[in-house]
Amino acid sequence: MMFRTLDDANVQSKRVLVRVDLNVPMANGEVTDLTRIERIVPTIAELSRKGAKVILLAHFGRPKGVASDENSLKHVVKPLSKVLDHSVHFAEDCIGDKAKAAVDALKDGDVLLLENTRFHKGEEKNDPEFVQALAANGDLYVNDAFSAAHRAHASTEGLAHVLPAFAGRAMQAELEALEKGLGNPARPVVAIVGGAKVSTKLDLLSNLIEKVDALVIGGGMANTFLAAKGLDVGKSLCEHELASTAREIMAKAETTKCAIILPVDAVVGWHFAADTPHQTYGVDSVPGDAMILDAGELSTDLIASAIDDAATLVWNGPLGAFELRPFDTATVKVARHVAKRTKEGKLVSVGGGGDTVAALNHAGVADDFTYISTAGGAFLEWMEGKPLPGVDVLKK
């Protein structure tokens, strides 16, 4: 995929509207995780260094077109300034007189954060009038928010039709990593898909079995597939009503020559709680009163072996109830094996999705993967093979 980057833009003395992701976790008006802020620093710093007037656009929360203190981006100014090591101005609106006055006051190299775009209903409707009102304060548009690229909103897609549009460095890194993961990957490719429910990942599974050489199914999702094969999963989380769908996916995988890897043994417990008594059973002998809470040792060895044969790995979702020890064992063990193969230069590894990032951080290996995507919905839709409006408009 070819797309325009900052290398193609002349930004000196230009007003550059930069769409960023500042939808950061907050508690009592304080930012509790700086990851998303840290990701946008390279783009902002580069534009400022090159003499642009940097104007940041972002949403926060779901205010539905109504301004409120709790969803104001003013709370992000201080941590953003600190991480950026550069003063950040703030405007109390993203359009109109307040925004214009703040933009007009900027000198080359200055950074300005405009108020939450979602305080206006036109943002989520991609309303042409709202797009023009935003565009009035810019000469160029840079999108650095891959996490919002699956939404065709005014600040993520609309602006790219009315101003020269470029990908920021975080967006560029994400797109290049994803291209390595599924776009044009080194083969064989293995995908790990875990998490609780098959119902939320049907499109994902259907797309992957056409693109990967092996598909590892773990977490609560695996129980639905085991049940579909006629196995008793006891009191495990299981969507029995999707048994026929699971069988269809397995049948389709046979025609596309995609090997499906399911657990062969499971760690079961009798209560959904940390440190509850637990035991390992073959998946064909799970006690009727127990629930599967993690993949067993034979299963993790099987997954590790598939990873050893792979050149590329894409991971979305944990292999067990990783938030409850000791049911994090399979996820941690496999994650560390992926990290080891990646560090040895034998594997390109891409992971993404909320629970996945938390699980890989828990295993202490997030930094050892080739790339970790912090984009939840956009990463999933990319894995599902769906078009991303915010990306498509940046293509050359």
Swiss-Prot record:
Question: Can you tell me which residues bind ATP?
Answer: K201, E323, G353, G354, D355, T356
Membrane among keywords = no
Its annotated pathway? Carbohydrate degradation; glycolysis; pyruvate from D-glyceraldehyde 3-phosphate: step 2/5
**GO MF annotation, one:** phosphoglycerate kinase activity
The species this protein belongs to is Brucella abortus biovar 1 (strain 9-941)
Give the E.C. number(s): 2.7.2.3
> Its GO CC terms?
cytosol
Positions with a binding annotation for substrate: D21, L22, N23, R36, H59, F60, G61, R62, R118, R151
Full protein name? Phosphoglycerate kinase
What the entry lists under Pfam families is as follows:
PGK
Q: GO biological process: what's one of them?
A: glycolytic process
Annotated S-S bridges: none
UniProt catalytic activity: (2R)-3-phosphoglycerate + ATP = (2R)-3-phospho-glyceroyl phosphate + ADP
This protein's assembly is summarised as: Monomer.
Localization per Swiss-Prot or TrEMBL: Cytoplasm
Q: Which family does it belong to?
A: Belongs to the phosphoglycerate kinase family.
The entry's keywords: ATP-binding, Cytoplasm, Glycolysis, Kinase, Nucleotide-binding, Transferase
